[in-house]
Amino acid sequence: MPTQRKIETVADLKQRLERMQVAVVADYRGLSVADMTDLRKKLRESGAEFVVAKNTLTRIAARETGHEAIEPLLEGPTALAFAYDDVPKFVRAINEFNRGPKKITVRGGLLGTTLLKENVLDVVATLPTKDEVRAQVLGGLAAPVTGLAGIIAAPVNDIVNLLDATSKSILYALQARVDQLQPSSTS
């Protein structure tokens, strides 16, 4: 008979699996509590979560949510990291943590219901984050607007230059005529 705690754990894992865009399965052996806390903090900053779960309970949750593809990765001590929003930022947070003295061993993951090999996550880490994509899109949108402003301003500048040149020409012509009409002082 399953205990209430196990039922709640399965329900929690199901909810996370249903919400996630990417899940990473890792071996956390060798990490201290402080290391795990540091990793959780880094992942939380990227909008992700890191949980340690029993393989049996994870299998049950995976089967009930249609994520059976994760089952081959559930061997030995298992930790799961769930990304809900900005996947490249999430993978970069894991890679950044793994550059330190303590590392987690990434076994693979899920993208939706598709099994990912460990090396695919390295490719995902090279993708731009949401903020970077937004900046690129805004930059792309701003460039034509800036060009349009230049095109619109050009005729106005040309008119101003023409009027300036015309007024100077008229001024010089008037000055020349005034000089002609004035009696010369040598006469």
Swiss-Prot record:
Keywords: Ribonucleoprotein, Ribosomal protein, RNA-binding, rRNA-binding. Coiled coil: none annotated. The keyword Manganese does not apply. CDD domains: Ribosomal_L10. Gene3D superfamilies: 3.30.70.1730, 6.10.250.290. InterPro entries: Ribosomal_uL10, Ribosomal_uL10-like_sf, Ribosomal_uL10_bac, Ribosomal_uL10_bac_type, Ribosomal_uL10_CS_bac. SUPFAM superfamilies: Ribosomal protein L10-like. One of its GO terms (biological process) is translation. One of its GO terms (cellular component) is large ribosomal subunit. GO terms for molecular function: large ribosomal subunit rRNA binding; structural constituent of ribosome. Forms part of the ribosomal stalk, playing a central role in the interaction of the ribosome with GTP-bound translation factors. Belongs to the universal ribosomal protein uL10 family. Part of the ribosomal stalk of the 50S ribosomal subunit. The N-terminus interacts with L11 and the large rRNA to form the base of the stalk. The C-terminus forms an elongated spine to which L12 dimers bind in a sequential fashion forming a multimeric L10(L12)X complex. This is Large ribosomal subunit protein uL10. It comes from Roseiflexus castenholzii (strain DSM 13941 / HLO8). The lineage of its organism: Bacteria, Bacillati, Chloroflexota, Chloroflexia, Chloroflexales.
